[in-house]
Amino acid sequence: MSNIKEVLINKKNCKSVWFMRQAGRYLPEFREIRSQNQDFINLCLNSELSSKITLQPIKRFNLDSAIIFSDILMVPYALNQKVDFLKNLGPKLENFNLNKFLKNNEIDFVEKLKPVYKAIEITRKRLNKEKSLISFVGAPWTLLVYMIGAKSSKKEIDLKLINRKKDEISLVLEKLINYLCLHIDNQIRAGADVVQVFDSWAGLLPQEDLNSFCYTPNSKIVEFCKKKDIPVICFPRGIKENYKVFNNLVKPNGLNIDYN
């Protein structure tokens, strides 16, 4: 059993440290590859390069775990919503169309993400068996924020939009849970042995919406992972004093503590 998996399952007395962006933004070997691959989505779909980037920090620092090089927005991409990464601005998604979203199907979704699973397979074969391979997804709420353009600023959300579209949002969240579980299942089959769920924009939610839009969706994903006997780490960034409530309700194997 790999080190991090043993810590999460057997509750070893060990304080784990997560190196955010293990490769991205600072390793010169990564920056060289990135400079030659301007289209970020295509880079994530290049199985060989994705594996190579994943292993770069392991070769430098001999960390306990590798984190597959990918992005949470590969899911909207696979659901046929155009995703661009603009230099110095970050991700930009085309306007959300509910009817188009609802026409998606699982077969096409998996087909578009096959290069991601291939990258996991390649990496697992190259990675020391004592080291974990962590895959990840964005939580439903966080993906939805990007997909419907719900952010009005870096630290605020368009509450009028959220309140106006609550029925639509609930429908989209439920669909996203299903697609995310499918994505996780395929990552596990490919060789991932730990899953991380990033709820990067959980902190934007008002208190009254945390249960419906954060706790419940995360709980369903955690339950799915546990049925697969795969430990899961959650990161509901920005929920502050609600971390204890999240932990008690969602019951992940591990919890990233917010750094704000």
What are these regions (language model features)?
Residues M1-Q81, F85, K220:
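N-terminal basic, low-complexity leaders that serve as flexible interaction/assembly modules and, when applicable
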Residues F30-E32, Q81-L93, Y146-D158:
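Short, flexible, mixed-charge acidic loops at enzyme active sites
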Residues Q36-D39, L98-D108, I162-S170:
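Short glycine/proline- and acidic residue-enriched helix-loop micro-motifs
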Residues I72-V75, G90-P91, P140-T142:
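A short acidic, glycine/proline-enriched capping/turn motif at secondary-structure boundaries
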Residues N88-R126:
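A gly/proline- and charged-residue-enriched helix-loop-helix capping module
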Residues K112-N260:
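Active-site loop segments of alpha/beta catalytic cores
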